[in-house]
């Protein structure tokens, strides 16, 4: 049985946090990393690793979203949208050629602190495959050619409930004083901030850049918003997204760390279940809703909250969570 809903206040907090960004398990055995090539100096591999790990920390985050150029005569670009928050980024695991970083929002509302598990980014060195978005409700494991994976890292972004969002492959570069990773063009579903408006576009084709900077890092997105409803995708409008992570000690990270300590076992089991589905089906089918994202999002987040509140045991939460994913991913 799925756990009953949280009080309306907590549900609103979950949905608000999920809408902040164009967001945020290990990859299955089918997506194994290859060991560092003998042709790549060990120091280069380690330099990449340290650049990835440098994204962990405690931050104030600023989100800037701006539609710039319309390619549809009937579409006017939206006004700039600004938001922000406090977010910690913690290392879930570091296995050398596989690194996982979990983002957790720590929000203050008057006297109350609300913690929400946010997106997650997984990095794999020289991946054999990557999880990619195929269209409404569907993701698949896409092979990566030997040429494309040589010296490269995949980054897979997972949503708040550890369901997939998008994945891409790229290389870290260190030119012009910048430590920067740049992805290949990647398809992704609409962020909730767009989906709730029922816009003419229904997907993004984006290029991601993760760039280290003094006192933090920045996530740059160059998104072409596309409509695929009439067949082949057609460009509607180009958007820039700038998510800036600035190191901060102006708030206590403890509520976020307490949440993660209480729920990380549950989320490890949830990641394993998503892995199981990926391996079983060669991808993931899961329905999406405009306001809440994948249909698994709200019930899984509520289960984690009930676990932290002591209203359900970890074993029971895991059993219910696995059942939620199983039902949602069966056509």
Where are these regions (language model features)?
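N-terminal secretory signal peptides that target proteins for export/translocation
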Residues: 1-9
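N-terminal export leaders
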Residues: 11-21
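Hydrophobic h-region of N-terminal signal peptides that target proteins for export
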Residues: 19-30
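Amphipathic/hydrophobic helical signal segments and adjacent flexible N-terminal regions
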Residues: 28-54, 66-80, 95-102, 107-110, ...
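A short, Trp-centered hydrophobic/proline-enriched beta-strand micro-motif
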Residues: 56-64
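Hydrophobic/aromatic beta-strand elements that line small-molecule binding cavities or substrate pockets
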Residues: 77-79, 83-93, 102-104, 120-121, ...
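Extracellular-facing segments of soluble proteins and assemblies that are Gly/Ser/Thr-biased and enriched
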Residues: 105-171
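Short helix-loop boundary/capping segments
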Residues: 150-205, 225
